[in-house]
Regions:
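Short amphipathic coiled-coil heptad-repeat segments
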Residues: 1-14, 195-235
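A short glycine-rich beta-alpha junction/loop motif
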Residues: 2-6, 15, 36, 43, ...
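Non-catalytic DNA-recognition/assembly elements of restriction-modification systems
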Residues: 3-33, 168, 226-242
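Sequence-specific dsDNA recognition surfaces
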Residues: 6-7, 23-41, 53-90, 240-242
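Short, well-ordered beta-strand elements within core beta-sheets of diverse protein domains
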Residues: 9-12, 73-77, 122-128, 168-173, ...
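A short beta-sheet element
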Residues: 50-52, 61, 67-141
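Short, surface-exposed secondary-structure boundary micro-motifs
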Residues: 96, 185-187
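Acidic/polar-enriched heptad-repeat coiled-coil alpha-helices
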Residues: 183-184, 191, 198
Length: 242
């Protein structure tokens, strides 16, 4: 059966999907301005989302139980206005060296841990709309949303997006059960990607180990690891003599 569509500002969407502005959907909450040197990976009372991790490390939906999130070195570094994040909050990276500016993460599975948003981020909390966990993280990293940001990016060497500009973007709100189905499908893909990445990383370690053992070390003439049938010493020649 062909699904009935309606034409909206961002294109044709299903008739039972809603559209609302970023401003209608979110309220911006307070972040901090801590740089990487104020963070550590050893431990602490409060963890901090750095914009660089949003751009290069974190997936669209940040599982706080699984991802390594740096800690604030000292609580005294946090201003009293900094607000703790909650499940369902989104954090936008407002600065980058390219058009990845505007990448978003959605916070999930915080549990009892404390988390804040750091330098060059725009943390936001939903004030209108019923969203399935994960929907905003996936939707706001789609081309449909990110392309809305592109006209508002400023800067030459460093790209940035302002709170005022991002407030003009539009948020799609499908029926809740459809959001859940879409998120479930994308979660399966993300899990597959994560699993395959771990396998590839293990293979890379094996390869690097082979590279270090299958070639002679300095001042040696035989490698530590050899293939069957090879026992002779290796020769070393200058490239110009070959």
């Amino acid at each position: 059966m062909v699904r009935e569509l309606k034409h909206m500002e961002i294109g044709d969407i299903p008739v039972d999907w809603k559209l609302q502005t970023f401003d209608e959907t979110f309220r911006v909450i307070s972040n901090n301005t801590l740089s990487r040197e104020n963070l550590n990976n050893r431990g602490g009372a409060v963890r901090n989302i750095h914009y660089g991790d949003i751009l290069t490390k974190f997936p669209e939906v940040l599982d706080c139980n699984e991802e390594e999130i740096p800690y604030v070195n000292e609580l005294s570094l946090l201003s009293s206005s900094t607000q703790l994040l909650q499940d369902g909050d989104i954090v936008v990276a407002d600065t980058a060296e390219d058009e990845t500016v505007g990448k978003v993460i959605e916070v999930q599975n915080l549990g009892d841990s404390k988390l804040v948003a750091g330098l060059h981020t725009i943390p936001c909390r939903v004030k209108k709309g019923d969203f399935a966990p994960g929907w905003l993280g996936y939707y706001m990293n789609s081309d449909l949303f990110h392309n809305q940001i592109l006209p508002y990016i400023t800067g030459i060497k460093v790209s940035s997006i302002s709170k005022g500009a991002i407030s003009k973007t539009l948020i799609l709100v499908p029926p809740f059960d459809e959001q859940e189905k879409i998120v479930q499908s994308l979660n399966k893909i993300q899990l597959l990607m994560t699993t395959e990445t771990k396998v590839v990383n293990k293979i890379k370690l094996v390869k690097n180990g082979c590279l270090s053992k299958m070639f002679p070390q300095k001042d040696d003439t035989v490698p530590k690891m050899r293939l069957p049938g090879f026992t002779e010493a290796w020769e070393q020649r200058k490239l110009g003599n070959m």
